[in-house]
């Protein structure tokens, strides 16, 4: 009983400290007015999904008026949530106040890993954390494209995380996108494969094919089962086989069979 009472008292003290700290913080900004907004967007030279004008547009749509507003009246958490909810290219938004009257906004963009184009032409990205994200009208990311016999539309995956589904093996029968996510993660983790593969195709049987930048052939991967082993075998074949016979000798190079590479010659 004493231990339980002790824990309750500690919790009450912490809660009281938090409330006091927030009150003191708000009091510090009581007589300061918002004089301007400073927006910082990370990696803006590489990914250009978001601009400062996009942030301004969200404020206008939500009727968020901050010019000359008292700093202590600015709802920090509400503003952060609004920004993240309205623009799915934003991974994280941090809003903070300064004693100089400037409202700071720091934006972390999502980093696309791959692009999906399904049979109906519906297209979307999956970022490097496995989160599905829509295309942007203002910027196209240069990432691996997966197309072919893919039926899963964007709306079926809104809010889903492919990384978690891949790790838990949580996918329905016939669903292949978590496997494609695993494949692209592996490709991007290798300097060789990152520079070699530019496109993924899923054929009518559900088998995965890789389209290389160098060489007039198709890599028949099949599935992502034993993926590391398959890519190691391909690396050895590239070095020992194609380097001798030429990069355009074969039409297909199949890795589908365990510990085997089966090639189809070009006629």
Please place each PLM-identified region on the residue numbering.
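Charged, solvent-exposed interaction patches on well-folded alpha/beta domains
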Residues: 1-43, 48, 52-53, 61-87, ...
